[in-house]
């Protein structure tokens, strides 16, 4: 009879692959991204100014129906039914 070796869990780290990758954690962001609360107030105010200064006559208006909202909420994953049922 052949002797059977105990089965090891398949793990790519055990196969000689060296991982010399330096991966920063999600919270180790640099610059203005690290503290959006400080810059967020200025961005919000400038966005609001741009919205108020737009011409109402030249702005495009599209009819939005219930089906559009259902499809959007389905894409965002905030409904309990499947996307194909929309």
Swiss-Prot record:
Disordered: region residues: 38-62
Region (NGE-like): 31-49
Tissue and organ distribution: Expressed in testis and brain.
Transmembrane segments: none
A molecular function GO annotation: type 1 melanin-concentrating hormone receptor binding
One Gene Ontology biological process: chemical synaptic transmission
Entry GO terms, CC: extracellular region; synapse
Pfam family name, one: Pro-MCH
Start and end residues of each stretch annotated as Melanin-concentrating hormone-like: 68-86
SS bonds (residue pairs): none
Region annotated NEI-like, chain positions: 52-64
Family to which this protein belongs: Belongs to the melanin-concentrating hormone family.
Name of the molecule in the record: Putative pro-MCH-like protein 1
Taxonomic source organism: Homo sapiens
Gene for this chain: PMCHL1
């Amino acid at each position: 009879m052949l002797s059977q070796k105990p089965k090891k869990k398949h793990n790519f780290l055990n196969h000689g692959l060296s991982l010399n990758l330096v991966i920063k954690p999600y919270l180790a962001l640099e610059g203005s991204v690290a503290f959006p609360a400080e810059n967020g107030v200025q961005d919000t105010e400038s966005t609001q100014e741009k919205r108020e200064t737009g011409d109402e006559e030249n702005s495009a208006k599209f009819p939005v129906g219930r089906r559009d909202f259902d499809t959007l909420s389905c894409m965002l994953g905030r409904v309990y039914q499947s996307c194909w049922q929309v």
